[in-house]
Amino acid sequence: MKIAILGSSGFLGKVILKKALDEGFQIRTLVRNPEKLGELKDKVEFCHGCVTKIDKLEETVKGVEAVISTIGPPMKKCEDPEYYKNSMEKIVTVLEKQKIKRYIHIGGAAHLGGENENWTIGRITLRLVLKIIAKPVLIAKQLEWDVLKKSNLDWTLVRPPGIMKEVFKGKGVIADEKNLVRTKINVEDLADFIIEQITSKDWIKKAPLVAAG
């Protein structure tokens, strides 16, 4: 099965890329700087460019069956949330045009969801901290989600809390639409969960809160 990954050179993206390769997926990825892929560069097809360029998006997703995106606003440099909304609109347009249904995007546990979600102290704290240090990030991720909800894609918006290298007690990932059971998650476990969503139908058109099990 061939998939595309947008944002494969970052902290989470590299882990997803490596694990997907280990599981036998063929991968094409869109990167601004292929050298950031390190030794993985020679194991994937890559398109050199930016997600805001329609032609590069079309080249990246041509012939794939699913797309994973970790692209999002950096914590310290998100000055224009509309930029990320526009990027999401372009992604949706290209995928719908090429009839690629499955799309998995990474959001965050601090973002607003459904009316029945439970706001624990830990989750409220996450949101308050982001409002103070990176309010444009919250706005950008909310705008991305608004675009997704209006699309015809079989999307899943994965909402993790703090992503850590640290290994936690317990096992795997707990995913829930209403509850965030912890404020941290191991990056390897998160990557496993995201890759599982490529073929899973459990969370289509949903936005699970995910945390360490």
Where are these regions (language model features)?
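N-terminal Rossmann NAD(P)H-binding glycine-rich loop of SDR-like oxidoreductase domains
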Residues: 3-23
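NAD(P)H-binding glycine-rich loop region in Rossmannoid oxidoreductase-like domains
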Residues: 4, 35-90, 94-97, 198-199
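Conserved SDR Rossmann-fold cofactor-binding beta-strand/turn motif
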Residues: 31, 107, 159-162
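Conserved Rossmann-fold NAD(P)-dependent oxidoreductase catalytic core, especially the SDR/UDP-sugar
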Residues: 34, 90-136, 144
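Substrate-positioning beta->alpha
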Residues: 84-85, 139-140, 158, 182-195, ...
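Conserved beta-loop-beta element that borders a ligand/cofactor-binding pocket
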Residues: 145-166
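Core catalytic loop region at the nicotinamide-binding pocket of NAD(P)H-dependent oxidoreductases
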Residues: 155, 200-213
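Glycine/proline-rich active-site loop of Rossmann-fold NAD(P)-dependent oxidoreductases
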Residues: 167-172, 197-206
